[in-house]
Regions:
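Alpha-helical transmembrane segments of multi-pass membrane proteins predominantly involved
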Residues: 1-173
Length: 173
């Protein structure tokens, strides 16, 4: 049933792009906000972020956990749909691709957990002072992305409905 597999794959791509677009935009906006004060994008510059920017730490944790595919965040739905679409193909190459994806997911999750550990457990780097503030536009972007990341994980039907190809084709007519 190749048509079902093709539709499943296309739907998972749309879901993945929407969710990961929000999640990555939010994460990079946090990196920009932190780098404005620390003058660095290095992981170490996030040290002790919880002590001087708890809100930013929580938001970045949401984005990183979503990127790692931790439920109930949007990244979990995106990864689940992607793996399901690949496995629906039922071929040996699909299983190999899923195994490679699983290994990549585990490696990426370890990286994201490392960043979270630095933010929550490490001390603030020596000589780093200043409060992290964001312009309203960046703050709004981070907030919208965080809300979208959480809501699409809890209510995945919102993005799944958007990814319904029959509806998308109907809109294009």
């Amino acid at each position: 049933d190749g048509a079902h597999v093709a539709e499943s794959v296309l739907k998972s791509i749309v879901v993945y792009l929407v969710i990961y677009g929000l999640t990555n935009l939010g994460a990079f906006a946090v990196v920009i906000a932190v780098a404005r004060i620390t003058r660095s994008g290095e992981i170490s510059s996030f040290g002790g972020l919880i002590s001087h920017a708890p809100g930013m730490t929580i938001l970045m944790t949401i984005f990183l956990a979503s990127l790692a595919g931790i439920p109930p965040l949007g990244g979990w739905i995106a990864k689940f749909n992607s793996f399901r679409a690949v496995l629906d193909a039922g071929s040996t190459s699909a299983y190999v691709l899923a195994a490679i994806g699983a290994v990549n997911t585990a490696i990426a999750a370890a990286y994201y957990m490392r960043v979270m550990r630095v933010m929550w457990m490490n001390e603030r780097p020596e000589g780093q002072t200043g409060t992290i503030t964001t312009p309203p536009s960046i703050g709004a972007a981070i907030g919208i992305c965080a809300i979208g990341t959480v809501v699409l994980g809890i209510l995945p039907g919102l993005v799944m409905r958007f990814a319904d190809l029959d509806d998308l084709v109907g809109l294009a007519r």
